[in-house]
Amino acid sequence: MTNIRKTHPLAKIINNSLIDLPAPSNISAWWNFGSLLGICLILQILTGLFLAMHYTPDTTTAFSSVAHICRDVNYGWIIRYMHANGASMFFICLYMHVGRGLYYGSYTFTETWNIGIILLLTIMATAFMGYVLPWGQMSFWGATVITNLLSAIPYIGTDLVQWIWGGFSVDKATLTRFFAFHFILPFMVSALVAVHLLFLHETGSNNPSGIPSNSDKIPFHPYYTIKDILGALLLIMILLLLALFSPDLLGDPDNYTPANPLSTPPHIKPEWYFLFAYAILRSIPNKLGGVLALMLSILILAIIPLLHTSKQRGMMFRPISQCLFWLLVADLLTLTWIGGQPVEHPYIIIGQLASILYFTILLVLMPIISIIENSILKW
């Protein structure tokens, strides 16, 4: 009799995705982040569900409902901090996953890559709206500043902002709709993840060498299931260390002050995972220009496949491109640091130079260096 996992309509899908899936024999730990992102998503949905049971999306009670979760709900504190720090772990895994795609040329799977960009944008939107919900000072002013950026859109800008706010300022209507969207978006993310995997399984995984691995495949289970479990244990261990020992390490102290429309915090800044984009936004003195640069800093990923000029797929055998890639990583870390600093000399000029370098590396240097490497190898 044939095994039920190979015949049952539902079990068959799981079997072909997680058990009998042919996988390259040489994929490294950089290929672990996909499964880690899946674990992060499940964790966030579960902790978020339990938080939503006790949270009230109302300007008068939102802040105190979060305090109530931490003080009065059984294990509410750990659920809240797992959710808050889970978002940070989510973005660490996301950036590593995207970085891996850039380094090893995984973006040549254009459908998978494009769905990945949509996923990234959706997750960023979800995280932004989630940050507004505790209704602390940074929640309120972060929401005000970021939504206000849309007013830079010519002609319809102001109307658009007021439409999103549901009034003339960030208020009760804004909080309620942000809660509704924050709840629904992770399920949309889950659906997009299924599409992401669907496209990936059409082609199979890339591997560090960038050479087709059809002649040397191994079953996903047990080799990569055990490898994924190791990654998951490390992820959960780091998350628990964060949540239990220093839960507020990555947060902003201002968010422990209830939202007050009459007092602006001295330094308005988003969560650490948005600081690089925030630094790019602030580098341009013009409002519309800043908003465009902010959008392009993420959307530039969409044209990366068009800028691939190398005859090789990944960077494994391209040392000059490797140097450029790590320069890009250092540049992004610099931007992250600048995003958290006040707008004053020397931070302004450092941010501007780092922003220019970011776009120059991706749009100019990478394609040119790839062509030079081709000629060095006489290809």
UniProtKB/Swiss-Prot annotation:
A ubiquinone binds at H201. Heme b b566 binds at H97, H196. One of its GO terms (cellular component) is mitochondrial inner membrane. PROSITE patterns: CYTB_CTER, CYTB_NTER. Heme b b562 binds at H83, H182. Binds 2 heme b groups non-covalently. The keyword Iron applies. Belongs to the cytochrome b family. Component of the ubiquinol-cytochrome c reductase complex (complex III or cytochrome b-c1 complex) that is part of the mitochondrial respiratory chain. The b-c1 complex mediates electron transfer from ubiquinol to cytochrome c. Contributes to the generation of a proton gradient across the mitochondrial membrane that is then used for ATP synthesis. Heme 1 (or BL or b562) is low-potential and absorbs at about 562 nm, and heme 2 (or BH or b566) is high-potential and absorbs at about 566 nm. This is Cytochrome b. The gene is MT-CYB.
